[in-house]
Amino acid sequence: MRIGVIGAMQIEIDNLKKSLENSTTEEISSVQFVKGNIGEVEVVAAVSGVGKVFAAICTEAMILKYQVDMVVNIGVAGTLCKELGVMDVALASQVVQHDMNTSALGDDIGLLSGINQIYIPVSYTHLRAH
């Protein structure tokens, strides 16, 4: 299995990069990708930059170049949920594009034109505790 890990900022990915064995580095589309192993798992790590456009560019380059089986986005995030605190881990069950609104065209708020979905389910197929 090959896992891609993306963080928006260097501090979010530094410890992971230090943990990689037999690592190599390559730059694609101004993004530095570090490939290595943690045990028997191949890992490709990168700092995308802040924002969904940078994250999308990084994710696409990672998928096309390294054929990762899954991509995990790690790092700092905000929340409106009172139950979550600092250093808590949150896993989404679905994602939504919160800043897109084509309701003036008759669409529901949040609708992603083309795939005609508001909520996109997340797969937990590869997730397991070690």
Question: For each predicted feature, which ranges?
Answer:
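Conserved small/polar residues in nucleotide/adenosyl-binding loops
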Residues: T125-H130
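Metabolite-binding pocket within alpha/beta catalytic cores that recognizes anionic/polar moieties
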Residues: R2-Y124
